[in-house]
Amino acid sequence: MENDAGENVDLYVPRKCSASNRIIHAKDHASVQLSIVDVDPETGRQTDGSKTYAICGEIRRMGESDDCIVRLAKKDGLITKNF
């Protein structure tokens, strides 16, 4: 919901599963969120860029979370296409 100034005033903004696009409910204690950061190859330090993936508990229960993370990382260019 937005106020008159166009600012977001919701107290709770639900997350969506990156793999299935389902809403992750507040009581889904099996869900995980992974943040993968960009690293400078020379210094080994974190740069400003990062990518966040949220996986719902239903995907994890089926045992498909590793395949989903690899598919999403390939799509974003974090992993080579022939991995």
From Swiss-Prot:
GO molecular function: ribosome binding; structural constituent of ribosome
Pfam families xref list: Ribosomal_S21e
Summary of the function given for this chain in its UniProt record: May be an associated component of the ribosome rather than a core structural subunit. May act as a translation initiation factor. Has a role in regulation of cell proliferation in the hematopoietic organs and the imaginal disks of larva.
Subunit structure: Component of the 40S small ribosomal subunit. Interacts with sta.
Biological processes per GO annotation: lymph gland development; regulation of cell population proliferation; regulation of translation; rRNA processing; translation
Keyword terms of this UniProt record: Cytoplasm, Developmental protein, Endoplasmic reticulum, Ribonucleoprotein, Ribosomal protein, rRNA processing, Translation regulation
GO cellular component: cytosolic ribosome; ribonucleoprotein complex; ribosome; rough endoplasmic reticulum
Domain of life: Eukaryota
Organism listed in the record: Drosophila ananassae (Fruit fly)
Gene name per UniProt: RpS21
Localization per Swiss-Prot or TrEMBL: Cytoplasm, Cytosol; Cytoplasm; Rough endoplasmic reticulum
Keyword Cell membrane: no
Similarity-based family: Belongs to the eukaryotic ribosomal protein eS21 family.
Main location: cytoplasm
UniProt cross-references to InterPro entries, sorted A to Z: Ribosomal_eS21 (IPR001931), Ribosomal_eS21_CS (IPR018279), Ribosomal_eS21_sf (IPR038579)
Record-given protein name: Small ribosomal subunit protein eS21
Ribosomal protein keyword on record: yes
